[in-house]
């Protein structure tokens, strides 16, 4: 079987023109809802026992191509409305409404502001390690109610490069997931999951 290269995957993965009237470019589906067919098929769709489209808030053919394309590049994907939505969705699910997130102060401004002003409203405490590449400092900052370690592979905007492999080892020693924002590096330069990261987030507008 021929293995497609990165440059081919980034423009072709997840899309079959034959499923879209032979359109060369991915169509933009603007509909909110979809014909469900008969009631039996509708029941299967709403029970998620059959793949298909019901309502665009849940799934949309255009978004599905994006998810499948990123999955081909980086191993898996869920597309959300923004990079900040991806960060929030990930961390709130990991923290389950409480606990602590361990991170670096070297972060994208939107993330840093959210950590300061929004996350405490959800019962989360954010702990900062001044040098995220200091293993002893990271270990010392982990507490019993720490739920995840979050880091940017290359911080925005000051370009601090995180030692993902070491951070993953420390996180896993303590039963924690490592979440990496890989926006600046992109999967072309770095695939954090290959170095031990558990979850990876991106802002598509920046790469």
Label for each model-derived stretch:
Residues 1-29, 65:
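Short conserved active-site loop signatures built around small residues
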Residues 33, 38-89, 110-119:
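Conserved N-terminal alpha-helix of the aminotransferase class I/II PLP-enzyme fold
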Residues 10-16, 78-207:
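Conserved PLP-enzyme active-site core in the AAT-like
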Residues 20-28, 43-48, 92-96, 125:
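Short, mixed-charge, low-aromatic patches
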Residues 2, 7, 41-42, 51-54, ...:
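Glycine-rich, flexible loop/turn motifs
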Residues 6-10, 67-72, 196-198:
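Short, hydrophobic/aliphatic alpha-helical segments
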Residues 1-4, 73, 155:
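Short intrinsically disordered, low-complexity coil segments enriched in acidic
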């Amino acid at each position: 079987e021929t293995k497609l290269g990165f440059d081919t995957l980034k423009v072709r993965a997840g899309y079959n023109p034959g499923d879209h009237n032979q359109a060369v470019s991915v169509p933009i589906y603007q509909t909110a809802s979809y014909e469900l067919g008969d009631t039996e098929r509708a029941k299967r769709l709403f029970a998620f026992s059959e793949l298909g489209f019901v309502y665009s808030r849940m799934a949309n053919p255009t978004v599905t191509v994006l998810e499948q394309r990123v999955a081909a590049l980086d191993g898996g994907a869920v597309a959300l409305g923004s990079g900040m939505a991806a960060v929030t969705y990930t961390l709130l699910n990991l923290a389950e409404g409480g606990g602590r997130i361990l991170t670096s102060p070297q972060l994208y401004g939107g993330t840093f502001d959210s950590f300061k002003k929004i996350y405490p409203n959800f019962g989360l405490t954010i702990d900062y390690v001044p040098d995220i590449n200091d293993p002893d400092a990271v270990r010392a900052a982990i507490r019993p109610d720490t739920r995840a370690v979050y880091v940017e592979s290359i911080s925005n905007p000051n370009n601090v490069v995180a030692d993902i492999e070491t951070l993953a080892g420390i996180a896993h020693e303590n039963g924690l997931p490592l979440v990496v924002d890989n926006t600046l590096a992109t999967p072309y330069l770095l695939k954090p999951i290959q170095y031990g990261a558990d979850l990876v987030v991106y802002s598509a507008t920046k790469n």
